[in-house]
Regions:
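Active-site proximal loops enriched in glycine and acidic residues that flank catalytic Cys/His/Asp
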Residues: 11, 41, 214, 241, ...
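Flexible phosphate-sensing "switch/lid" loops adjacent to ATP/NTP-binding sites
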Residues: 1-327, 334-350, 357-358, 365-371, ...
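Short, hydrophobic alpha-helical segments
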Residues: 230, 262-270, 397-401, 526-534
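Acidic/polar loop patches that form or flank catalytic/metal-binding clefts of enzymes
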Residues: 271-274, 380-381, 400-406, 449, ...
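Cysteine-nucleophile active-site neighborhood
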Residues: 17-20, 24-28, 32, 344-439, ...
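Short beta-alpha connecting loops at secondary-structure transitions
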Residues: 57-65, 243-247, 353, 374-382, ...
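C-terminal and late-domain segments of enzyme folds
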Residues: 435, 439, 443-534
Length: 534
């Protein structure tokens, strides 16, 4: 395809309607037709990236292969498309302004007054088109964060308006809105959608396709009414009804020919409808599964639905791969202790100790780990979860009562987890951790090696602290083996206790490398061990 096509996904009425899922689903449909597709997210906040944002504020922080801390929607894009993203796939207002200000300081604007239009909008447009020009994608789908009408989003909306004018048929806008159902009146209300589209039109954009989020199926009369009042073709009004799983959304859109409508509007040949066989097989396995596997997730942000999004989805994918339904139980680590851990965790087939930062809730993780170790419950520790495995083992097996991480207690006698050498002179918090994909060599015969089926793997990281190798011999002599390490630095990446059924801690984040068609092998192995433990 000669020219890259650009599709913008905007949202109206309320936030959290699922623009990211719609963008990912549309991308999946186009990819299934043989097109090379990528998806990017523009976030209107002024932070450079979400790396320093509290999970309560923003949910999970996702990490790309090239080490960018990104919005959790990039996780959806990767899980749906099975294609890695980079820092170019997530742009914030902060990065746009930072780039423009740096150019102004260097004199790139030759003394011009730097303004939102054209300088900020030009920088936004440059970032929109970068992926298409650099990587030769057929389609670049751009999700605009926030809701139409938000003051923060205005420069992005203006940039979309300009691009629609400049790119002509190679550009279109998909607008997602909400159609509420008023139970007392027993009717749907389309007025919020009409006003949302009107707002978009006032900003110079006529949407080409409308996606209506709704809890119940809408009648043809309602969709025709929306088409009439919003200046949209009747076949370009698509419903996105609530479904049991987000992975059904591509099929919901496909049944309404959303991909066909978009291809026709862009002057492209439609061709036969793709089967999407692997996707359908995944959903069929999910539907057919009758037995369940109970996994307990121990973390300190469990009350927020999106805080461990990639872990949740990785567990689901691994459970389906093993022909099981996932029964996920969330345990707040601040509410766990040695006195209640056995009672609260006794029904779990497996335990996952979540990543995180800081002292709060860490004693509850130690209690869960001690229970799992003493009762031989399959257990996976990720990042801080792995570090907690090391600390608990040092305290309760090696007799180092004061063992700790220098993150929690800088003056601890036994620094079994310590700040990485290259982190000791770092002063800025943002974007300064060990980030992105790194190599790891696994010890043959280890649980991790058996899971991956190979010696050399690559997984993504997000941490400042590491296992202190000064204690390695003591741990190995006492039964906790270091079975994975970075080939260049010797940094310990994997620890496990071979005497137990399945007890593995990893410094990396395997959840960032798990998709619908390729679930992460470590999660698959962990869930299999939990099933065998029933």
């Amino acid at each position: 395809m000669a020219d890259t096509k650009y599709i913008f996904v905007t949202g109206g009425v309320v936030s959290s309607l699922g623009k990211g899922i719609i963008a990912a689903s549309l991308g999946k449909l186009l990819q299934a037709r043989g097109y090379k597709v990528t998806i990017q997210k523009f976030d209107p906040y002024i932070n450079i990236d979400p790396g320093t944002l509290n999970p309560y504020e923003h949910g999970e922080c996702y990490v790309t292969v090239d080490g960018h801390e990104a919005d959790l929607d990039l996780g959806h894009y990767e899980r749906f498309l099975n294609v890695p993203t980079t820092r170019s796939n997530n742009i914030t207002t902060g990065r746009i302004y930072q780039s423009v200000i740096n150019k102004e300081r260097k004199g790139d604007y030759l003394g011009k007054t730097v303004q939102v239009v054209p300088h900020i909008t030009d920088e936004i447009k440059r970032n929109v088109k970068l992926l298409g020009s650099k990587y030769k994608f057929d389609f670049v789908i751009t999700e605009i964060g926030g809701t139409v009408g938000d003051i923060e989003s205005l420069p992005f909306i203006e940039s979309v308006r300009q691009l629609k004018w400049e790119l002509g048929k190679n550009c279109m806008c998909v607008h997602l809105t909400y159609v509420p159902y008023i139970a007392a009146a027993k009717e749907f209300k389309t007025k919020p959608t009409q006003h949302s589209v009107k707002q978009l039109q006032e900003l110079g954009i006529q949407p080409d396709v409308l996606v209506l989020r709704t809890e119940h199926l809408l009648s043809n009369d309602i969709t025709r009414k929306v088409a009439l009042f919003c200046n949209v073709d009747a076949d370009a009004v698509v419903q996105s009804v609530d479904v049991p799983t987000i992975y059904e959304v591509p099929l919901v859109l496909q049944r309404q020919n959303m991909d066909v409508t978009i291809l026709k509007k862009m002057g492209l040949e439609v061709g036969p409808t793709p089967e999407m066989k692997p996707w359908n097989e995944f959903l069929q396995k999910k539907t057919n599964a009758t037995e369940t596997v109970k996994i307990g997730l121990v973390g300190k942000y469990v009350e927020l639905q999106d805080a461990y999004k990639s872990i949740d989805e990785s567990l689901l994918q691994a459970a389906i791969y093993n022909d099981r339904k996932l029964d996920l139980h969330l345990f707040h680590s601040e509410k766990l202790n040695e006195g209640n851990a056995a009672e609260l965790l006794k029904d779990m087939d497996g335990l996952l100790i979540a990543p995180g930062f800081g002292q709060r809730g860490i004693e509850g993780k130690f209690a869960a780990l001690k229970y799992a170790r003493e009762h031989d419950v399959p257990c996976l520790g990720i990042c801080l979860g792995m570090q907690c495995m090391v600390i608990e083992y040092a305290r309760d097996v090696l007799g180092m009562a004061d063992a700790n991480s220098t993150e929690m207690e800088p003056n601890t006698e036994y620094k079994v987890i310590d700040l990485m050498e290259e982190q000791k002179n770092v002063t800025n918090m943002g974007g300064s951790m060990r980030l992105g994909a790194y190599d790891c060599i696994l010890k043959k015969g280890s649980i991790a090696y058996q899971a991956y089926g190979k010696e050399h793997i690559q997984e993504r990281h997000r941490h400042r602290f590491e296992f202190n190798s000064q204690y390695r011999d003591q741990f190995e002599a006492a039964g906790m083996k270091c079975t994975g390490e970075n080939p260049e630095t010797g940094l310990v990446e994997v620890v496990e206790i071979p005497a137990l059924k399945w007890f593995v801690g990893v410094q990396f984040h395997p959840e960032y490398n798990s998709t619908v068609v390729n679930p992460n092998p470590l999660f698959v192995s962990f869930v299999k061990a939990a099933i065998d433990n029933k």
